[in-house]
Regions:
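Accessory alpha-helical/coil subdomains and C-terminal extensions
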Residues: 62-135
Length: 228
């Protein structure tokens, strides 16, 4: 079991009692930990994939992540990670395409070698730019956070704008999943946020009959519609 999210120590102990090997470090990206554990079995393209993952997880400044980033030109790695992120997010309900991306990366291809990735990233960027105006118009603020219901895009794509444009230390974006009777909730915290949002969201979501959690400044939840 390899993870970098906040886990209750009793869960780790229970896994170890079951003879599960646990690799768990909240200070490094999960993919970086996978690479570090199995690098002797991986090809020389693997550190590039791990570097992109660290950037996407805002963890390229950590000890292992920063060492990997030094291998590559920083701007090359940043644009590659960004393009891959937009392609993954834009196809998140298309497992065949996601599998195709995995296979292309496994064949040691860079994002610019994979057909149409930059064009698709441009489409995603255009969609995000449209969200900015909608957030400015539709978000609401409380004393310590900004929040907004998202109607026509993903909550995770809008939540950083909600936090930033509200001027608050926490942003919350939520979108109804009509087919499932739930709300998907994304939460982000600024660098000034002093509380561990992942733990708070885990407690709140589970107490409301949902589930959730994550990092101190980036997390998410699923909440039953009547409890939103």
């Amino acid at each position: 079991y390899i993870d970098h999210h906040d886990i209750d120590p009793t869960v780790v102990t229970a896994l170890q009692k079951l003879k599960v090997k646990v690799i768990h470090d909240i200070n490094e990206c999960t993919t970086v930990q996978v690479y570090n554990a199995y690098k002797s079995k991986l090809n020389d393209h693997a550190p590039f994939v791990a570097t992109c993952a660290a950037i996407t997880d805002y963890m390229e400044d950590r000890p292992l992540g920063s060492k990997l980033l030094q291998i590559y030109d920083r701007q090359f790695a940043l644009i590659s990670a960004t393009v891959m992120t937009y392609n993954i997010v834009g196809h998140q309900r298309e497992p065949d395409y996601l599998q195709y991306l995995v296979e292309e990366l496994s064949d040691s291809k860079f994002p610019h070698d994979i057909p149409n990735t930059f064009e698709f990233a441009q489409i995603q960027v255009e969609k995000l730019s449209q969200i900015i105006a909608k957030v400015k118009k539709g978000m609401k603020t409380m004393s310590n956070l900004g929040h907004m219901e998202i109607l026509d895009s993903g909550a995770s794509g809008a939540v950083n704008f909600v936090m930033g444009l509200s001027g608050k230390d926490v942003g919350v974006a939520y979108k109804e999943r009509v087919d499932h009777g739930i709300y998907a909730v994304s939460v982000r915290g600024s660098k000034n946020c002093k509380v561990h949002l992942g733990r708070i969201v885990n407690f709140l979501a589970t107490s409301l009959g949902g589930s959730g959690g994550g990092h101190d400044k980036a997390c998410g939840a699923v909440v039953p519609k009547p409890k939103i």
